[in-house]
A protein has these predicted regions:
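Folded, non-transmembrane soluble domains that reside on the lumenal/extracytoplasmic side of membranes
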Residues: 20-203
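Bacterial N-terminal signal peptides that target proteins for export
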Residues: 1-5
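Bacterial N-terminal signal peptides
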Residues: 6-17
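Core hydrophobic alpha-helical membrane-spanning segments
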Residues: 202-212
Length: 213
């Protein structure tokens, strides 16, 4: 094979492929897998962060009966929008107690550069979209923009669980950043935000360095 074609094939093989797409059925349900609340299929969270998230959400469930799942995925290819994927996963897993609609799904799609938070109708009064939006803008996205997925996810879950438990939440924004914070989808108890593209490009660049190094 000519060297030029070998080089082209190598480059193409290292690019993100449609095979990375994930279906609802392929996302491990943490409740069934190990009795927890976190499914990190994108591998962006540390073990210590997952442990702390599980602790916070277990405490929330014990005190209020509300349930929360934290999910990371490489992308949501094959679905109309990241929000559509999130809503379908929320319903597929049946997050929240039966008859109470008191579930929350916090989803991060790295490839789509999206943060999606879906809330059950039973929580809309205490956790309206406006409050969720505030948490995303002030606590989650600024940290994600700095490459801190652990910190952003923890900060978001801490705020969400505090609100759901009726605890006072300090309205202190995180450090300022260049994150795009315009809302692109806010409907039916769901809030979506974009993650700055430079962060994902940095992740892909790092992946390329690891593969090629």
């Amino acid at each position: 094979m000519p060297k030029v074609w070998a080089a082209v094939l190598l480059v193409v093989s290292l690019l993100p492929q449609p095979a990375w797409a994930i279906t609802l059925e392929q996302v491990p349900n943490p409740r069934r897998q190990y009795g927890g609340w976190v499914s990190d299929t994108a591998n962006i969270l540390s073990s210590s962060t997952e442990n702390e998230l599980n602790r916070l959400i277990t405490q929330l469930e014990q005190r209020t009966s509300a349930e929360m799942a934290v999910v990371t995925v490489p992308n949501t290819q094959g679905y109309a929008t990241p929000k559509d994927f999130t809503t379908q996963l929320f319903n597929y897993w049946g997050i929240g107690k039966a008859g109470q609609n008191n579930g929350v799904l916090f989803l991060i799609s790295v490839g789509d550069r999206r943060v999606e938070i879906e809330t059950g109708r039973g929580l809309v009064a205490i956790l309206p979209d406006s409050r969720v939006q505030q948490i995303i803008d002030q606590q989650i996205l600024p940290r994600f923009r700095n490459g801190d997925f652990d910190g952003g996810t923890l900060a978001g879950v801490r705020q969400l669980t505090s609100v759901l438990q009726g605890q006072p939440v300090a309205n202190v924004p995180a450090a300022a950043s260049g994150v795009t914070t315009s809302t692109i989808a806010t409907s039916s108890g769901a809030v979506a935000q974009g993650i700055d593209s430079s962060l994902v490009e940095g992740i892909l660049l790092l992946l390329g360095i690891i593969i090629l190094g």
